[in-house]
Structures are given as C-alpha cells and as structure tokens.
Amino acid sequence: MLQFSFQNCKTHTCYMNTSVNEHLDQDESFLRILIDTRKKIRSSYFKPQTFDEFVHCLARVRAMKRLVSICSNFDEEDNWNGVWNTLVVDGDSHASAMIDYEGLLDKCSLSRNLLELINDYAEYTTQVLPFRKIPSSDNLDSSLNLTVASPKSNLYYRYSSESPKYAKILDCPDEILQLIFSYCYDASYIEKLPFAFSYRKQRHTLIHDLPNTCLRFKKILSPRNVSFWKRLLKVHKKNPNSAVTCSESINTSAVAKFTDIPTIIPIFLDPSYQSYAAKTIHSDTSSLASSIIQTGDGTQSCDESTYIELACNLVGRCVLCNRIPKLTKFKDCITSFYRPSVATNICDQCLEAIIDFYEPVSRYKFDVMKDRLGVGYISRPGQKFPSWLSEHVQLARDEEKAFKSIYHSQGEFARSLFRLFRAQLAELCEQ
C-alpha cells in the first residue's frame, strides 16, 4: 500500500481546485456535442460496421495489449509485495489475522480483469463486455487511497467504499477535454500571416500558464529558435500584404482577456475521418494553397511553396493551434492526428504540451485527477508517478503503427476475420 505525497507542490493545490471548479460546467452545449460524439465512437468500436472500422478496432486492441505488456509500476509492486512478504516472513499470526487478504484482493481485482477482456475482444466475440465499477472519490479520505496490484494483469486500480460509478475501457470523461481547451486554447491569438511577430510581443496564456516542465512547446516559440523565425521571416517577406510586421506596435488592450471555448469544429468531431482526409491529403498544392491563405483583395491565391511547407509540416491544423495535418505518403496519417478518446484533432506538439501540463497536476493533486478521469492509472517502468495522458500518447502511436501493419501486411487475413465477425454478429441479432 502506498501513501502519495504532494509536499513538493503545495503552492499549486489551491489554484487547481479553483480552476477545476470554474471550468467544469462552462459550456453545456459543447459538452453535449462531445458526449454524443463519443457515444458514436464507442458504438462503432464495439460494433464496427465497415472494414476500416474493424481494422481500427484491431489496431486499438493490439495497441492496448502492447501497452499492458510494457506497463508495470515497479515501485507499487515492490511496496505491495514488501508488505505481504514482511507479514509472512515474520510469522506474525496476530497481524495476519487482523488483515483480510482475500477480501482486500476481491475488492480491488476484477472478476475478469482488463487483459482478459481485451483477449475476448481480440478473439472477436460479440458479447457485451462487462465493465468494472469505479468508485466515486468526492469525499474520499487520503488515508483510504490504496493502490493494489492485480496479481494477474499488473494493472493498478484505485478503490474506495463510496457509491460506484461506471466507466468503460478507453473511456475518458468529457470534462478532461473542457479543461484542455480552457488551459491550452490561446484566446489572444488572432490568425494573421505571419502570426509569429505579434505572438512574441504579447503575453499568452498557452505559454505562461503551462508549468516549466513544458519544454517542447516553449522551444518552438522561443526567440532562441533561430531557424524557426528565419523561416517565418522568409515567408513574411514574400507576402507583403500581411497586416502585421515586425516593427508594428501591438495594441494589447484590444486583445480579449477571455473568449469562449471554440465550438466551430464540426469536421474535427466527425468520427469517420475519411471525408476530412480526402479533402486534405488528396488535394493538390494549388488548391491547398488557396484554401490555406488568401491575399488582401481575396482574388489572388498564395502559391508560395515555403508557406505551404510551413503550414503543412510545422504544427498541423488542430483545434488548439489551427494548423492542418501533416501531408505524408501514408493516407492514414490522419488517424494519429485524430484522437478518438477525446473526439477531436490535436496535433502532436499541442498534445505533448497538454501532457506536460497534466503530468505535474496529477502528481500534486492526485485525488482531483482520479475523480475527473475516473480510470485506473498505469505507468511505465521507471516512471515513479502514474499519469493517464502519457499512456494515451503511447497508445495513439502504437495504434497508428498497428493500423498500418494490419492494413498493408495482413489485409486479406483481416478481411476474413471481419466476415467472421459480421456472421457472429448476425447470429447474435437473430437470437
């Protein structure tokens, strides 16, 4: 049993409590859209209707199994085994009699653990998967924060005696996306070409509100990143109609201190990403240029290859930084750009910045993160504190690799399995 310590970050605890309470119910309509979208994603995951959906399911299963195989928290395992072995070796019959080992394990382990559920789905059974109950932690005392290792799966779950709530595999509550938007959406950014010169002169919530651990994202917009600014300056000189120049003064008073969470993202919320992929990947550079930027009169399009390269390869279009996906030779590159668990497009660099923000949050306020996420935490070997978002990134990368492998190398075999899956599903519906 572990006792989590938050002594290193007491100064941030009050800030996190206030911020979480501020943004939970900020936009009900946006939250409703996300809930509906994620319902569609979950239904398509458990009952894929097309071959592409089926391949995505297989890729997700393979990624989950790989993640489970490499995830084992050695610190917790050693501590738990140490407590167990101490009692056994010492032969303290009185202490052993006071602890109900069997009852303690029954409360913390699944009747069928997560790995067995994944194996069931990997065998293409059509039964509804039973989900474990995850207790509420609203009034959970810190002394009851137990982390116990399941002897079969090396996964670690949180337990309390409070009233349970239900959670599903790969199920992340919608509040997490609202927090992501609230903390990482930069309200002061106005889309201009080039955005860099105005960006460097203003104070921005995205950069300044992130902890010092956010190194990757800071390096991109750092004044010391000379090559980055040279590329943008080159683009700026080739586009004289740009409204902002390096010497212009910026009216910071006109910048809104706060704007609502952006809700105009219908194309990013579409679980079937094929329509968006067709519009971006299969379009030629001329149409891409005209869709990216237009000059002041609105009639001539920019055909500068430098800017196209910048817009396509620098960050990519996402709901946070508003750039388009990278154009690669793989048509399914959009699958890693679209994040199924949060039902929206987030580029790798913004997601890394989000992770850099949430990892320290989970360390100094574990109860809040556990309550908001509602899922068991797992961590890699050598990672002392568990965090959900880092595993989400690893899962997305593994899923992308698995999708390419299945689709290109095992296509015929996957099609045979899909026919078998549909046949079993039809038999189940007839019953």
UniProtKB/Swiss-Prot annotation:
Keywords, alphabetical: Cytoplasm, Endoplasmic reticulum, Nucleus, Ubl conjugation pathway
Boundaries of every F-box domain copy: 172-186
Organism: Schizosaccharomyces pombe (strain 972 / ATCC 24843)
Subcellular localization, as worded in the UniProt entry: Cytoplasm; Nucleus; Endoplasmic reticulum
Name of the molecule in the record: F-box protein pof14
Factors inducing expression: Expression is induced during oxidative stress.
Assembly and oligomerization: Component of the E3 ubiquitin ligase Skp1-Cullin-1-F-box (SCF) complex. Interacts with skp1, cul1 and erg9.
Principal localisation: cytoplasm
